[in-house]
């Protein structure tokens, strides 16, 4: 039932936009990837993965992709190439265990990881330390959060509230958060 609804929605968005995205968004460009049916029929692994880029800053939004979906996308050379200079990764599936794929970090070395999640109520939500280590592997100091003056590697809506990245065209960015956690 979910897959049928997803396919109907997906088929409905086939109309071209009037202005190219990168011309109407002030220099922001987007590149998307997704898995096909078959082999995937679950909506999580059919998530559209979007890379938004402004200057050299790039943020990756993978939706609810799970490990099998990541592994399928990693078979594509263009996807692997796009991962290389990712600045920020939004953790897949709200940072849950089933959205984590260790092989992703062979190509993607983000300076920070963002997890959009609520209070911990499931054992599968305890991935913050794992994601933190993936940042430390390549960026030991993480990023500076202007609101708190602290170096961070993982930011979560659970702890930080809203998270805002102000980015200039040189790729420099400042992070602000709602909370002072």
Residue ranges and their predicted role:
Residues 7-88, 159-181:
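Core dinuclear metal-dependent hydrolase active-site scaffold
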